[in-house]
Amino acid sequence: MTKFIFVTGGVVSSLGKGITAASLGRLLKDRGLKVTIQKFDPYLNVDPGTMSPYQHGEVFVTDDGAETDLDLGHYERFIDINLNKYSNVTAGKVYSHVLKKERRGDYLGGTVQVIPHITNEIKERLLLAGESTNADVVITEIGGTTGDIESLPFLEAIRQIRSDLGRENVMYVHCTLLPYIKAAGEMKTKPTQHSVKELRGLGIQPDLIVVRTEYEMTQDLKDKIALFCDIKKESVIECRDADSLYEIPLQLSKQNMDDIVIQRLQLNAKYETQLDEWKHLLNTVNNLDGKITIGLVGKYVSLQDAYLSVVESLKHAGYPFKKDVVVKWIDSSEVNDDNVEAYLSDVDGILVPGGFGFRASEGKIAAIRYARENNIPFFGICLGMQLATVEFARHVLGYEGAHSAELDPSTPYPIIDLLPEQKDIEDLGGTLRLGLYPCHIKEGTLAEKIYNKNDIEERHRHRYEFNNEFREQLESNGMVFSGTSPDGRLVEIIEIPKNDFFIACQFHPEFLSRPNRPQPIFKSFVEAALNYQQK
């Protein structure tokens, strides 16, 4: 039977519940268990797809096309698994589904209430995460902080699930903060005690407490927390601030967290703790020699979480070369043809990531032109690819006013446009090309050299496509369309062979990068930047 672990947080937000959950998932996976992981978000948006990146950070896309919380990116990268649409459940999605059922008459005229209707819907989605993956263990992070009014239906649902499935199949992990009071020169357990008291007031007794702390905890502090929170002493786990996130699984393993969980849930682990690969990764991260600077030209750079997976993928790509990839954040709204050199003359490579909307697009086009004309390694993603074709049409073909129909509907040269079947759809939600799609790579191209194969699958999140009416003109002037959909209709990868490294893709390769297995285009881009630096 599938076992369920719930990770809650108390005292303050941003404690690292997601990293704790992901680290535990990694430890259990390395013991030979099949793990999946899930995030409950208490906000009322159906999904983050139409939320501002300034509010929410990046939207992480799963293989099956779900637009989800950026924490799912951490989960996938840490545990090295591919998640699905059941891995992100929002209050908006739950309420929306219940209200649709009510309108259809599924409740036979009954009064629809938070208990049992909302809580039952939450429990159903919890069970689907396990059923859809055939997992041994489902780890579920509850967003927000214990005591938040928005989280109450989720906490009630996970309280009920213990009675539904049996105590031996459910475990509660609570993350808290141990603040250091400088004036007193000591750490205080009282916030943790009150947080657990709040949780117990909701009917949930933690089995394990993970304490976020700046300094090493004494045994006396652990004993005190165990006494007042009614748990075993060994179930108080210290999670100290670390220079690298990759240290956290090792910290938790050293305190036997995986053994405690396996014993408590009576799991059948196939192996003893195996962390050699993880230790090798951490050793690499801690011993990087030199740096590579990548200029990231985007419109949301004031909130760097908007490009979280891109930055992580760049970091991963530096590890095989023992290099620290440093991102120079460049606000594309401030860039133009006159000042672009001042922004980009000191970088080793230029990356233009995805985005939506007209604002700041001209700055991105200026950066792309600078990369192309000065033979600086360039990598464009999604909108970055679309604008690379626009820049080429304007400055190589001389198509003045060329643009994307998304950004300038009146352009005389719509290099990027909607597919014909999309033109009558008005709602923004649910109209994107989302999820994993196949791509065929042309022989003898840079893309083939990068992937070392001709058929790949990558995740997408876009609405507009390259307009094939202009394909022949761009090709005859030196642009190569090296990757397309299998039927040849949709452009997926473009490159300019005249340059040492100029490639852009319609898909989002950052969603499939792993710390120990960098995504191929990112790895090749960083290698090209290193070669450029050494010229």
Curated annotation (Swiss-Prot):
Record keyword Lipid metabolism present: no
A Pfam family: GATase
Active site: C382 (nucleophile), H508, E510
Chain positions recorded as Mg(2+) binding sites: D71, E141
HAMAP family in alphabetical order: PyrG
Family assignment from sequence similarity: Belongs to the CTP synthase family.
Protein name as catalogued: CTP synthase
Native source species: Staphylococcus epidermidis (strain ATCC 35984 / DSM 28319 / BCRC 17069 / CCUG 31568 / BM 3577 / RP62A)
